[in-house]
């Protein structure tokens, strides 16, 4: 049976908003000058909109559209919609990254920690680069931590005797993201000048079971959705103990290494 489409909890996701926003800021810092002013920008997989507003700070006159397929996330993002301080505009709309194709030329299409949820997303790159204006940019960031303890322990538990009948097909792994080299090859094959890199952040998290608290907002969502409240509580209890051993708390906090892969592709003018 196919896994349920994950449900999203914006409040849970935003509990680590500062840490989650850092990679997006680093991604935007590598985006070159855009070809038009005012620019037209799409944020594909905008979530609750808290980082989409950073785009308006970088390009204050831009017409920005945040796109997401989660009604819960879009409802939260609506608080940021409207005219921006620099004379631009920020709007949000429903769209699915699995099928979205630009209907008009964009100066920048950006995506932050979304494409890992899109099976076959590397095959979507041609449609997105085709949707760029001459001189435009496609920029995205994906988590590269699927072999880290936080994900490995989740998968091992999902495939254990107690849970495998319900969760064996719920979590993706090998095909969720590609290597930096694969993204570089795909983007340069499309005729783009590509800047691809990876970084491992060492997040120092505070509070009780902070790694569990983090993944409840993202990677654990398919499990929580598939199981429902009662069984999810039992799964989380087992998972919590494994995470405590893998990520021991110290007097300064809990260190959570998080690898991420970045790509910025510039289309020829």
Swiss-Prot record:
Decide whether keyword ATP-binding is in the record. Answer: no
Pfam families to which the protein is assigned, alphabetical = Methyltransf_25 (PF13649)
EC number(s) given by UniProt: 2.1.1.144
Alphabetically, the GO molecular function entries are:
trans-aconitate 2-methyltransferase activity
Stored InterPro entries: Methyltransf_25, SAM-dependent_MTases_sf, Trans-aconitate_MeTrfase, Trans_acon_MeTrfase_C
Subcellular compartments: Cytoplasm
**EC class:** transferase
Q: Which GO terms describe its cellular component?
A: cytoplasm
Principal location listed in the UniProt entry: cytoplasm
The region annotated as signal peptide is: none
Q: What keywords is this UniProt entry annotated with?
A: Cytoplasm, Methyltransferase, S-adenosyl-L-methionine, Transferase
Do you know which NCBIfam families this protein is assigned to?
PRK14103.1 (NF010703)
Role, per record? Catalyzes the S-adenosylmethionine monomethyl esterification of trans-aconitate.
Record family assignment: Belongs to the methyltransferase superfamily. Tam family.
Recorded protein name is Trans-aconitate 2-methyltransferase
| Origin species | Streptomyces avermitilis (strain ATCC 31267 / DSM 46492 / JCM 5070 / NBRC 14893 / NCIMB 12804 / NRRL 8165 / MA-4680)
Q: What is the lineage of its organism?
A: Bacteria, Bacillati, Actinomycetota, Actinomycetes, Kitasatosporales
Originating gene = tam
């Amino acid at each position: 049976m196919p896994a349920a489409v994950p449900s999203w909890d914006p409040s849970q996701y935003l509990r680590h908003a500062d840490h989650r926003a850092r990679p997006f800021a680093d991604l935007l810092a590598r985006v070159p000058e855009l070809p038009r002013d005012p620019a037209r920008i799409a944020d594909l997989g905008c979530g609750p909109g808290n980082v989409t507003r950073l785009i308006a700070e970088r390009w204050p006159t831009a017409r920005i559209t945040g796109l997401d397929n989660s009604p819960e996330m879009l409802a939260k993002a609506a608080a940021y919609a409207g005219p921006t301080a620099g004379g631009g505009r920020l709007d949000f709309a429903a769209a699915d990254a699995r099928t979205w194709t630009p209907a008009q030329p964009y100066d920048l299409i950006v995506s932050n920690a979304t494409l890992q949820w899109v099976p076959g997303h590397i095959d979507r790159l041609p449609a997105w680069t085709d949707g760029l204006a001459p001189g435009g940019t496609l920029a995205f960031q994906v988590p590269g931590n699927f072999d880290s303890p936080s994900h490995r322990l989740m998968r091992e538990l999902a495939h254990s005797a107690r849970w495998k009948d319900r969760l064996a097909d719920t979590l993706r792994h090998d095909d969720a993201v590609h290597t930096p080299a694969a993204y570089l090859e795909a983007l340069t094959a499309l005729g783009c000048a590509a800047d691809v890199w990876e970084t491992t952040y060492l997040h120092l998290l505070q509070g009780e079971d902070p790694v569990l608290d983090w993944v409840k907002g993202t990677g654990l969502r398919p499990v929580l959705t598939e199981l429902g409240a009662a069984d999810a509580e039992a799964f989380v209890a087992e998972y919590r103990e494994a995470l405590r051993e893998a990520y021991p708390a110290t007097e300064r906090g809990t260190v959570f290494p998080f690898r991420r892969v970045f790509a910025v592709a510039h289309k020829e003018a």
